[in-house]
Amino acid sequence: MAPSSPEVSRIRNFCIIAHIDHGKSTLADRLLEMTHTLDRTQMDSAQVLDDMDLERERGITIKSHAVQMKYCSVAGDDYTLNLIDTPGHVDFSYEVSRSLAACEGALLVVDATQGVEAQTIANLYLAIEAGLEIIPVINKIDLPSSDVEGVARQIIDLIGIEREEILQVSAKAGLGVAELMEAIIARVPAPADNRKQPLRALIFDSVFDPYRGAVVYLRIVDGVLRRGEKVRFFANDKIFLADEIGTMALKRQPKEVLEAGDVGYLICSIKDVKDAKVGDTVTHAEVPAEKRLAGYKDVKPMVFSGLYPVNSNEFEDLRESLEKLSLNDASLVYTPETSVALGFGFRCGFLGLLHMEIIQERLEREYDMNIITTVPNVEYRVIMTNGETVIVDNPSKMPDTTRIAHVEEPYVSMQIITLADYIGNIMKLGMERRGEYRNTDYLDTQRVNMHFEFPLAEIVFDFHDRLKSISKGYASMDYEYIGYRESDLVKLDVLLNAEPVDALSIIVHRSKAYDWGRKLCGKLKGIIPKQMYEVAIQAAIGSRIISRETISAMRKNVLAKCYGGDISRKRKLLEKQKEGKKRMKQVGRVEVPQEAFLAILNIDE
């Protein structure tokens, strides 16, 4: 490796790792302000980098962002700092790993009032694997409830560093930020000077611009990229012309050349963000690099759900909205499907539950769509008796039980960090959700890190909410996918008057099927409105009915006009009413309200 040139030696690429609400975006604002990338008057909003309304409201970062800052150190040297803001949530862990690969250092931000959380640890391990220099930062030190020394001990136990290496700041008040800037200069290594080698650049994000096409954010690892050169993408072997390249302050700043160590953007008339995959390598078309950068993988959706417009005339609008969303979100997968109960809609694949919620909320907010969402489920592998494997992401596609040899479901390894007082509650929740307990590590006298393995299907419903409520908000979780395992799973159908409602079908473990069936029938009885005829709600596994509830008919008192009189006259009127109800039952269809589909989501309440 050649020694760093003066220019490259003055570049620092770093990111910020933090749990939700630990003050990452506020700290980024202070750094932007201190380097005069922005002054206070331009900061019309807190959290400048979180530019989606949803990002601000939920206090999370959904997309990766990059911003370049110029900084003059105390010694009088000018430096270029590239801050890559990463998502912190478990659903986006692949995006995080690619953003980390574009850096040499990471600020580990921990809230002085909360301590180390599960997602902090998960992303910290990703950073250590990527070989980054870690600078621990305790934030919110000015709050009365802060426990700086206690949190410092947790960090020392976690990464084994000296107490004096841990910085203390208050991002909101701006305390300690100047010392943090100097620490970034002193401790984060400069990029390697690989300008003489063939071009290799790592894509860590892409956004869609309606006028320019996909804008690719990349870190130049080796070589030099000039405007007007032809570039090739490794993943799909497509060649594009680099129309515009440059660096990112808060707005794009065009440049003629990007060199090894630089973080910038590339616009080359890419019509679809799916061509610019996160983690892919860009090289020259004429003299390409031999090998791509390590770590690229295709992101596969983990959670599937059906999205249907409430008004079936809006199907095309929903298609357009999903198309526009997928321009900016390459991990959203969708295919059209039809349901007897709900009409035309789409089967969508998401990275996880948060990703699913965000897509739904953006459809409702940004595109004014009214949608019904079916129960989220995972992708099962069904091994048939003839040896072939069928992938099932929708319960209605489950093959006939007589042809199934066995079913496999995805499992995840999960770590839960909580106070020691709540171990019992969490163990109980783990057993309820078919979890396999592995071990517990004590982070300090109060906090523990518990390790479980769960079927993914058991945590996609409301696991996070339940975890928060039984631990009074103190527990945090993080999980990673570990593979498929064989399970005794069955398809539970719901029938209304002997007609199956496909959108209410679910795949559950046999041990839970009876309980689910009973709860679901009871829940639906309270939601489906009364009809003029009796409605039977049944839960069935195959042809076996395991639970039933009956909604009694609304009936008119046909005897009201008979004052006393002959019993045979009354009987005649009652028989006539009975015949009418019978005919109604044959031709009538029970309307299933939207609440019925949501009932499955909160069945335990």
Swiss-Prot record:
Supply the EC number(s).
3.6.5.n1
Where located? Cell inner membrane
PROSITE patterns, per the entry: G_TR_2
Which GO cellular component terms are attached?
plasma membrane
What EC class is this?
A: hydrolase
A GO molecular function annotation here is: GTP binding
Q: Which residues form the tr-type G domain?
A: 9-192
Q: Which CDD domains match?
A: EF4_II, EF4_III, LepA, lepA_C
Q: Which domain of life is it from?
A: Bacteria
Query: What does the function comment of this entry state?
Result: Required for accurate and efficient protein synthesis under certain stress conditions. May act as a fidelity factor of the translation reaction, by catalyzing a one-codon backward translocation of tRNAs on improperly translocated ribosomes. Back-translocation proceeds from a post-translocation (POST) complex to a pre-translocation (PRE) complex, thus giving elongation factor G a second chance to translocate the tRNAs correctly. Binds to ribosomes in a GTP-dependent manner.
Protein name in the entry: Elongation factor 4
Protein source organism:
Chlorobium luteolum (strain DSM 273 / BCRC 81028 / 2530) (Pelodictyon luteolum)
Provide the gene name from the record.
Answer: lepA
